Amino acid sequence: MEGFSLNQDRGSMQDALKQYKHGLGTFEQKMPLMGRKFNEFTEQCFAGNSLTEREKQLIALGIAINAQDEYCMIYHTKGCLDQGASEENILEAVSVAAAFGGGAAFSQGVTVVQQCIEEFGNTTH
């Protein structure tokens, strides 16, 4: 699996999402029990309860921004869009992440996250 680089062509966010899903699939093949248990755990964590799925995706995006995890930023920006979050909702989450994480978090939000919004629009993953 090739590494992801923001210097790739305009399709790089979709490519990165595919790379992540490919890596996850490879892990599940090699470690089926762990892969299945991880997926069950995260599916339950992101299921709507007292917080909606949209709110949980926005929280996860803020965490990914602060962790400087580009794959998770891409995945959860897409998840926010898929759950009906508006660009304003997403950018507000970026702002909260920046309030906590400073300039490093803000730079990720105004580059990686913005590129995801532009590339993915309202498609599903």
Swiss-Prot record:
Domain of life according to the entry: Bacteria
Record GO terms (molecular function): oxidoreductase activity; peroxiredoxin activity
Protein name: Uncharacterized protein YurZ
Organism per entry: Bacillus subtilis (strain 168)
Gene name linked to the record: yurZ
